[in-house]
Amino acid sequence: MNTNTSTSAHPSAASGERSSLVRLYLSRGILAVVWAVAFAGARDALDGAAITLLVVYPLIDAVSSLIDYRALPEGSERRVTLFNGVLSTLAAIGVGLAGASGVEAVLHVFGAWAVISGAAQVLVGLRRRGPELGKQWPMLIAGGLSLLVGVFYNVQALGDDPSLSALVTYAAGGGVFFIAQAALLAWRTRQVRTQTA
């Protein structure tokens, strides 16, 4: 499914959109990996540093969604991106409040956010599929995994020994998928430039 008819009709617009997404995805991916490294050292105690990092992660997603939203033309993809930005902002607030209640509450909020934002990411990935922006496999896989991992977090929160350690793998994995998508889009941009030169 490809709803990017406006960009395919105007190659320069499509190239600009690809370049914008390359920068956004690369930045988002690097920030996620850096966050994972930082949280790996702070996750043992749910103290002020850990809660701050937990709030920052969905805020990174919220800012990324806002940047993406502002770069998109009107349409349903833009609405989904705005929804994800608002959702991530609410998740940051929710995680901050849940931090006072303990690991279980944090996992529930993080899990609910991961499920809904993962579904939104899959939807945006499906809408971006096409000749201009590629198949979007890294984004589709990352969104699907986010959805499944979110369910796992909620199940884990109900268990005997809930832990925040899985968030490190989640963030690092998500970051790698964003970096992979940026690399694929950069390759596609180079390929298109070579064909039109």
Report the location of each language-model feature.
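C-terminal ends of transmembrane helices
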Residues: 62-75, 121-130, 182-187
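Polytopic alpha-helical membrane-helix bundles and their juxtamembrane interface segments
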Residues: 14, 41, 155-163, 170, ...
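Membrane-proximal helix-loop-helix units in multi-pass membrane proteins
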Residues: 90-139
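Structural signature of hydrophobic alpha-helical transmembrane segments
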Residues: 45-60, 102-116, 168-175
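N-terminal topogenic module of multi-pass integral membrane proteins
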Residues: 1-73, 190-197
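C-terminal transmembrane-bundle signature of multipass membrane proteins
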Residues: 173-196
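Hydrophobic alpha-helical transmembrane segments in multi-pass integral membrane proteins
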Residues: 35-37, 91-101, 145-163
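Cytoplasmic-side transmembrane-helix entry/capping segments in multi-pass membrane proteins
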Residues: 75-87, 134-141
